[in-house]
């Protein structure tokens, strides 16, 4: 392999027009790896720290020049001369250099930019695509996409508290076919919204953001759009929700403005069960507040045998917190967001821990994205079989889908599309 000879970071803009960190890693062989870091809107309390400048005179305080400086100085000095193939060692050096539990000194946006750029440089130097470099030579699955077609919560300016309403083309025979299915439903939904007088502006993740009267109305729209596109809801396509419940949990209750009601955790679990019974919902993310472990236990006991229950804010891609959740028997799947933990090595450790305990993993973007498509390669490399990367619009979302098309093409007959088998943890 080849040693690192230069590391350089810069401030660029993400899909929301906010600054983020991009990093270039140059090796002595002459190859370069480049990576850019995403940013979330609804964030878990225990996520690794995204370092912002706080200078209100620049980007309303959201600048990342401090993180860039950390990359170009402390991190570069510590890593130059090390072989780029030593990913775990490099990540551990940055963890120790930071010295905090949450990357609070250097910033997770600094460490992650370097970590991903190192992997890209090493893959390029080895003459391998990133998914092969990280995943090895074994069989690989393309992920079933969770396509966010209706946005609510923190991702849209409407009355829906549930943040994401997603379609999953489980009946497709290939990723290419799944992407076509999703695109056709997305365009059918646009026509449907037009016909009902709903605006067809899109939210942060590219889905529509109609001002509906209830969550059931959103789900019914999805059923109608699926059928209008020529597919069967419950057979060809299943639905997934991201409740982002921590955003509407206050004083021990779940407050749904769209429904005009507040619920205890037991009542909210029943409410979610009623949606599952009425609509073909296979996956619910953050169905309870991140600190409501009792609520999570109730929800898991009620729905965990038939519905994928995904911990995002609950686990924040942190192996230690995931281990606690596994021990307590809450949820049955992990949402994987690389910037929640701040290095590739820790991300891969979390996915491995989930697999060993029969928890599914869902590779995920953030609402503030860039054209970086690393998570597409990661989804294939880890065989996690599911990816959540937004709707069928906005080039920051399509970059990931298009990369998966390329990977499927490269793998040819070796590419597997799991469909419903992606939910292997259910009915155990």
Swiss-Prot record:
UniProt keyword Disulfide bond present: no
GO cellular component, one term: cell surface
Primary site of residence: cytoplasm
Domain of life from the UniProt record: Bacteria
Cofactor list: Mg(2+)
Pfam families assigned: Enolase_C, Enolase_N
Keywords tagged on the record: Cytoplasm, Glycolysis, Lyase, Magnesium, Metal-binding, Secreted
Enzyme active site: 205 (proton donor), 337 (proton acceptor)
SMART domains registered for this protein in UniProt: Enolase_C, Enolase_N
Binding locations of Mg(2+): 242, 285, 312
Residues reported in the UniProt entry to bind (2R)-2-phosphoglycerate: 163, 337, 366-367, 388
Pathway terms, separated by semicolons: Carbohydrate degradation; glycolysis; pyruvate from D-glyceraldehyde 3-phosphate: step 4/5
Record-linked CDD domains: enolase
Keyword match ATP-binding: no
Catalysis performed (reactions): (2R)-2-phosphoglycerate = phosphoenolpyruvate + H2O
Protein localization: Cytoplasm; Secreted; Cell surface
A GO MF term: magnesium ion binding
Annotated HAMAP family: Enolase
Assigned protein family: Belongs to the enolase family.
Protein name: Enolase
Native source species: Neisseria meningitidis serogroup C / serotype 2a (strain ATCC 700532 / DSM 15464 / FAM18)
């Amino acid at each position: 392999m080849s040693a690192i000879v230069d590391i350089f970071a810069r401030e660029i803009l993400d899909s929301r027009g906010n600054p983020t960190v991009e990093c270039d890693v140059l090796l002595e062989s002459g190859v370069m790896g480049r990576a850019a870091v995403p940013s979330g809107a609804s964030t878990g309390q225990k996520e690794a720290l995204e370092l912002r400048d706080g200078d209100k005179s620049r980007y309303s305080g959201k600048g990342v020049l401090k993180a860039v400086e950390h990359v170009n100085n402390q991190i570069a000095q510590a890593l130059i001369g090390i072989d780029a193939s030593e990913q775990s060692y490099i990540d551990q050096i940055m963890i120790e250099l930071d010295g905090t539990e949450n990357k609070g000194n250097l910033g997770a946006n600094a460490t992650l930019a370097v970590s991903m750029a190192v992997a890209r440089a090493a893959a390029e130097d080895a003459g391998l695509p990133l998914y092969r470099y990280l995943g090895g030579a074994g069989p690989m699955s393309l992920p079933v996409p969770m396509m966010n077609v209706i946005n609510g919560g923190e991702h849209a300016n409407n009355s829906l508290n549930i943040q994401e309403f997603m379609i999953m083309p489980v009946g497709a025979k290939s990723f290419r076919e799944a992407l076509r299915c999703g695109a056709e439903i997305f365009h059918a939904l646009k026509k449907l919204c037009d016909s009902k007088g709903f605006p067809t502006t899109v939210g942060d993740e590219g889905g529509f953001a109609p001002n509906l009267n209830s969550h059931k109305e959103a789900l019914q729209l999805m059923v109608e759009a699926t059928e209008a596109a020529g597919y069967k809801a419950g057979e060809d396509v299943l639905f997934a929700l991201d409740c982002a419940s921590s955003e509407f949990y206050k004083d021990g209750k779940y407050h749904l403005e769209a429904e005009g009601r507040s619920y205890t955790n037991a009542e909210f679990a029943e409410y979610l069960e009623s949606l599952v019974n009425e609509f073909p919902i296979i996956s619910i993310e953050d169905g309870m507040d991140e600190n409501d472990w009792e609520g999570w236990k109730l929800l898991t006991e009620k729905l965990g045998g038939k519905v994928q229950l995904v911990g995002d804010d609950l686990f924040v891609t942190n192996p230690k917190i995931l281990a606690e959740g596994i021990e307590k028997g809450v949820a049955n799947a992990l949402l994987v967001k690389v910037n929640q933990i701040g290095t590739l090595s820790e991300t891969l450790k979390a996915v491995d821990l989930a697999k060993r305990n029969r928890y599914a993993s869902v590779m995920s973007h953030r609402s503030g994205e860039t054209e970086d498509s690393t998570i597409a390669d990661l989804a294939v490399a880890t065989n996690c079989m599911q990816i959540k990367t937004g709707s069928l619009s906005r080039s920051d979302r399509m970059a990931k889908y298009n990369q998966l098309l390329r990977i499927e093409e490269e793998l040819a007959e070796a590419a597997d599309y799991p469909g419903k088998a992606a939910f292997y943890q259910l009915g155990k």
